[in-house]
Amino acid sequence: MQLEKVPRAEYQTKWATNTVPKPTDFYHQLYNLSFSLTLTSQRWNTYGTGWLIDWKDTSTNENKFTAYLATNFHVADTLKNPHDYPPYNQVDNTQDLTTSFRIGKYTDPSLFGLYTNVKHAFVDVQLAALPKMAYAAVDFVDYRFDNKHWKSLNEICPEVGLKPYADFAVLEVPLYLNNKLDYQVWENFIKPAIATYKALGDSTNLFASTSSSDLQNDTYFALGYPLLESNIDAIHFNQTGATLTSVPVKDRIKVKNQSFWTLNK
């Protein structure tokens, strides 16, 4: 494990950041449902935010719990797992293979058994297994765009071969409860999110049909973990095999930019 402070001179932000909201705060439920995601390959790290959208309990396998996290497609698209579902298991370059997946949150480090003088920090945890792509919002509608529109897009990005898609995907995240770190993620991250999801009325209420006039009268808040320069305390729990180990100094992850929690209105 590792405790590392990331100093940044002239650090400023106009957003509400890096606080653990009280249960009475209006955005406490949003906080419970939101997580930082990090996908690592030999080439780079990809950062994003995930939100609990569904789960599969342990009724068929007492040692495995499956969480489904909604995220942006441009984040999930960097997942290169040869054991993924077809067609997402097709990987052209071995350097692009995802080597680790981390889930994080701005929270109390003592929840993970680390007692320091730091009351709150950005805590992220390497899971025992890689996620899979449960859903990607690509080619789900046969858009009939004017040919001139597609021509202009292809002129901008000729190598991409753009097709209709929405920036939305769902990752299937396995948690092996006989693994110490996975169990702690389930206990301290996922269980509070499930309780919040149910308190909001479960999917029946969350995705209920709402009139456009009602939507126009609502106020919306975006809560997530963007990658920004910061001076927050960051704690990284790493796995070797399926156990929690102390990470030698030479193996520590060096963080230049840090994902951290923001609330935007």
Curated annotation (Swiss-Prot):
The lineage of its organism: Bacteria, Bacillati, Mycoplasmatota, Mycoplasmoidales, Mycoplasmoidaceae. InterPro entries: Mycoplasma_peptidase_DUF31 (IPR022382), Uncharacterised_MG067 (IPR022381). This is Uncharacterized protein MPN_581. Belongs to the MG067/MG068/MG395 family. It comes from Mycoplasma pneumoniae (strain ATCC 29342 / M129 / Subtype 1) (Mycoplasmoides pneumoniae).
